[in-house]
């Protein structure tokens, strides 16, 4: 009995440590395995004829639900979709799917954030500067650690694969796969979302920063209403986007979405870039497609080569972030050029302003973008 109790305490501690539903379910299964004989003895007589098989079936169903989606089509609002060279959907490589299952992105963040000093050498080897690590440490010390986990909780029953593994495989094994996140509209009391409801929806394209197209961001963008959010990625984890990527939004991604059945309002196409992904905003400003965007939004990234553009520009950053320090002056310069400019700037925030101020930023973007679905 003492041995069982010790094992159970260790398993409960492991259950509390893990963040993902997948590993929490496995810990519960192991606890059940330790006490299965005792549990069987506690069952009423009529239930003993079934044994404990129904409980194992229930655990297996829960485990299956906790695994990332492999189906191309699912009822989830947030999905990771693999695309072939023509922009048509395809199943993800099985190896990438299995690694997604066994090493969920949520657990990588959970271990990295909670054990930052242990993970620091690995993070540094990946090119993350000491300033960013120090800022993360400061946020943790200030009680903001939950901000890094809330987006995963916000995904709810949605359980897409992680977008970073396709990029890791491209870098490490020279594969050439491409995957995007699609976040479908939530709809409101006036318009119930469906692909065939007779409405066209705004499209918000998100370009990630360094270290890849994380699932974490989708738990934030899920709260944008009345729009389709498309999170595209660079082939590697660099987050450096070029004019070619801007062209592909119109020649590759939008046609792909429309073949999937999404109805897009081409007058309401918005582009957002985070950190290194701000390179997409600079590229768009100097692209012939600048006129095709309704707004450009740079998050935690000063813009280079400012110029007058025929669309709105939004700047989001923090005063403790060197990557955002120029935003107030840049907003002023753009306004003097005649560009409608929105500024969300918090002097005491750092490079992680998006996770720390996600609700305020979402409300700011809703106001600036004025996302509305229109009848076809």
Report residues per predicted region.
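Gly/Ser-rich "nucleophile elbow"/oxyanion-hole loop immediately N-terminal to the catalytic nucleophile
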Residues: 193-199, 241-275
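Short beta-strand element of the alpha/beta-hydrolase
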Residues: 198-209
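Short amphipathic alpha-helix adjacent to the substrate-entry channel of hydrolases
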Residues: 215-231
């Amino acid at each position: 009995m003492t041995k069982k109790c010790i094992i159970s305490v260790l398993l409960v501690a492991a259950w509390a440590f893990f963040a993902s539903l997948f590993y929490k379910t496995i810990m519960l299964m192991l606890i059940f395995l330790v006490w299965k004989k005792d549990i069987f003895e506690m069952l009423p007589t009529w239930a003993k004829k079934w044994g404990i098989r129904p409980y194992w079936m229930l655990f297996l169903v829960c485990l299956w639900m906790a695994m990332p989606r492999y189906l191309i089509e699912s009822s989830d609002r947030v999905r990771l979709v693999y695309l072939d060279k023509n922009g048509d959907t395809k199943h993800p490589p099985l190896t990438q799917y299995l690694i997604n299952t066994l090493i969920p992105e949520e657990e990588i963040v959970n271990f990295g954030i909670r054990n930052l000093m242990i993970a620091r050498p690995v993070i540094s080897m990946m090119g993350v500067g000491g300033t960013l690590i120090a800022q993360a440490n400061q946020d943790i010390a200030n009680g903001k650690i939950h901000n890094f986990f809330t987006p995963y909780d916000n995904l709810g029953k949605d359980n897409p694969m992680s977008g970073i593994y396709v990029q890791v495989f491209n870098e490490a094994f020279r594969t050439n796969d491409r995957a995007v996140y699609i976040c479908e509209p939530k709809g409101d009391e006036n318009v119930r979302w469906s692909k065939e409801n007779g409405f066209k929806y705004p499209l918000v394209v998100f370009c990630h920063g360094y270290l890849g197209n994380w699932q974490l961001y989708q738990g934030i963008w899920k709260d944008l209403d009345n729009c389709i959010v498309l999170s595209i990625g660079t082939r590697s984890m660099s987050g450096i986007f070029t004019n070619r990527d801007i062209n592909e939004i119109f020649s590759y991604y939008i046609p792909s979405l429309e073949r999937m059945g999404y109805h897009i309002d081409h007058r309401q196409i918005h582009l957002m870039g985070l950190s290194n992904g701000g390179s997409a905003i600079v590229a768009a400003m100097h692209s012939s497609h600048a006129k095709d965007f309704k707004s450009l939004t740079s998050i935690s990234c000063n813009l280079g080569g400012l110029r007058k553009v025929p669309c709105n520009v939004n700047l989001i950053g923090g005063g403790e972030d060197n990557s955002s320090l120029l935003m107030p002056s840049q907003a002023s310069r753009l306004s003097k050029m005649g560009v409608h400019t929105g500024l969300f700037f918090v002097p005491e925030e750092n490079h992680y302003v998006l996770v720390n101020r996600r609700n305020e930023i979402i409300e700011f973007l809703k106001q600036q973008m004025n996302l509305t679905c229109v009848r076809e």
